[in-house]
Every structure is written in structure tokens, then in C-alpha cells.
């Protein structure tokens, strides 16, 4: 199938590349189907592009590359809904926001995206009883002295 993206142009994707979000994504509840687009093979950055809305895409960040201590408990009900198992482990992503400079990039630790790639289903979950922030700086001040590759 072909999808249009204002960021990536026309994309040819297979049904296996589609990730379904039965509950939508908070703020975009009508958007149920997205395609995951890695930035490159070894990058912790990727994009989640809506299959229906050309101008709707999210920057995703693989959290453990930057925040190895990031953890949360996924309840049995949620694990069951996503059909997670040892054979179908979760992939976890954070939605990122780039400010004027890449060194000011923040990620939402409070609402991770959890995906079962083998089954093609995902959900953004809202964590409770946590001190995680919705605007966690990805590059702490100590690292901000040197700009990451591709930054300004």
C-alpha cells in the first residue's frame, strides 16, 4: 500500500509494516494505523508515521540507549492486550520533541509507546505513581557542551 507523508514523501509499505493502535494515541484517538520508520539501522531514533494523515508523524527514541535505568511495570492486562510473551517481547519507545537545538531535545518518560512488532499492535501507556517527567532532557547539561552528531 502507498501512504503519503509530508516528511518522507510517498512510501510503499506492506501490511506487515503497519502497527495498529486500537485505542489510538492520546490526542490522536482516531489515528489507529502507523508505520514505524527507523532513522537508520543502528540509530536509537525512528519515526512513527500515520498511514492516514500525511502530516502526522512522531519522533521516537529508544530509551535504553540514553536512560539505561528507565523502567516501569507493564501490568498483566496490558501485556495480554498487546499479546506480549517471551516469543513476542515488547519494544519500548519514547516520543521525542526537538526544540531549537538538538541538545534541548526532550522525551516523554511518563507515556511510553509499547509495541509488539511480531503482532503489529501497540499502545501508548500513561504511567502512574511515578516521578517520570513528560519533558525529560535527553542530553543532560554535561553532555550539552558537545553537540551530538547531526546537531547544530
UniProtKB/Swiss-Prot annotation:
Q: Which protein, by its recorded name, is this? A: Flagellar assembly factor FliW
Domain of life of the organism encoding this protein: Bacteria
What is the species of this protein? Desulfitobacterium hafniense (strain DSM 10664 / DCB-2)
Q: Which HAMAP family match?
A: FliW
One GO cellular component, as annotated:
cytoplasm
Which family does the record claim for this protein?
A: Belongs to the FliW family.
Asked whether the UniProt record includes Disulfide bond among its keywords, one would answer: no
Keyword entries, A-Z: Bacterial flagellum biogenesis, Chaperone, Cytoplasm, Translation regulation
Enumerate the Gene Ontology biological process terms.
bacterial-type flagellum assembly; regulation of translation
The record's Gene3D superfamilies line, in alphabetical order, gives:
BH3618-like
Subcellular localization: Cytoplasm
Known InterPro entries for this protein?
Answer: Flagellar_assembly_factor_FliW (IPR003775), Flagellar_assmbl_FliW_dom_sf (IPR024046)
> What does the subunit section of this Swiss-Prot or TrEMBL entry state?
Interacts with translational regulator CsrA and flagellin(s).
Keyword Zinc-finger in annotation? no
Amino acid at each position: 500500500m502507498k501512504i503519503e507523508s509530508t516528511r518522507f514523501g510517498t512510501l510503499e509499505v506492506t501490511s506487515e509494516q503497519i502497527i495498529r493502535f486500537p485505542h489510538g494515541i492520546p490526542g490522536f484517538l482516531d489515528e489507529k494505523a502507523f508505520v514505524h520508520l527507523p532513522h537508520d539501522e543502528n540509530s536509537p531514533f525512528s519515526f512513527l508515521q500515520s498511514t492516514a494523515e500525511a502530516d502526522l508523524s512522531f519522533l521516537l527514541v529508544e530509551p535504553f540507549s540514553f536512560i539505561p535505568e528507565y523502567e516501569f511495570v507493564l501490568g498483566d492486562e496490558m501485556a495480554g492486550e498487546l499479546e506480549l510473551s517471551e516469543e513476542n517481547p515488547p519494544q519500548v519507545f519514547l516520543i521525542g520533541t526537538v526544540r531549537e537545538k538538538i541538545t534541548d531535545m526532550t522525551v516523554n518518560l511518563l507515556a511510553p509507546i509499547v509495541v509488539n512488532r511480531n503482532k503489529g499492535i501497540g499502545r501508548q501507556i500513561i504511567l502512574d505513581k511515578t516521578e517520570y517527567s513528560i519533558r525529560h532532557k535527553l542530553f543532560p547539561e554535561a553532555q550539552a557542551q558537545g553537540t551530538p552528531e547531526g546537531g547544530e
